[in-house]
Amino acid sequence: PRPISSAASDVYKRQVSGLDDIRPFYFKQGSIPIYASDRVVSALNKRFEYVFKKDVNIPGTPNVITNIIEDNFIFNRHEIIVLNANHGNLPIHGFRFNNLAYFTDVKTIPQQEFYKLRDLDVLVINALRIEEHYSHLNLNDALEIISKIKPKRAYLTHISHKLGFHEDVQKELPENVFLAYDGLQVECD
């Protein structure tokens, strides 16, 4: 059995609304560690008080263990590298797990972070749409970052209907870049 954990990079409702859905994992494995910045943990505490407040005892409520991240951390004997990025003007995190890096809701990645992204097998990064957006990468921005990082494979996530139909967009992408989809499983070393 694989240990279940969560790393939160931001607190937008669409990204954290599923927190309550970790119940089945809690029933199976017990306490679930959550890794996030202090800002994100504070917001989660307010939004999901019944989960985080220890003096509230609601049967079936998942037990989470919060871990404030400011730097790299260890999970299940693996180093997780914290990657700084920006969602518009808001600082957020991406994460590198071995040879896979994951970003969502990114608009910019500071230049000093790129050295942490060398020799990737897989990069998962957002590409919201074709047109510019004030707080998300568009397709061209994402492709420029992919070209700079040079992962073996890249998957575009956090895409909207404004990007186009899957088949039409996919055939225009470089051969190592793929549109992600629900249920996708990615293997890497």
Label each PLM-derived region with a short phrase:
Residues 32-39, 153-157:
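Short internal beta-strands
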Residues 18-26, 164-171:
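Metal-dependent catalytic neighborhoods of phosphoester/phosphodiester hydrolases
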Residues 1-8, 12:
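Single conserved hydrophobic/aromatic residue that forms the stacking wall/gate
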Residues 61-112, 182-189:
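Core dinuclear metal-dependent hydrolase active-site scaffold
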Residues 6, 100-101, 123, 154:
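Short, well-ordered beta-strand core segments
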Residues 29-31, 40-66:
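Active-site neighborhood of divalent metal-dependent phosphoester bond hydrolases
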Residues 10, 44, 80, 105, ...:
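Divalent metal-coordination and catalytic microenvironments
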Residues 110-124, 129-189:
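Binuclear metal-ion centers of metallo-dependent hydrolases, dominated by the metallo-beta-lactamase
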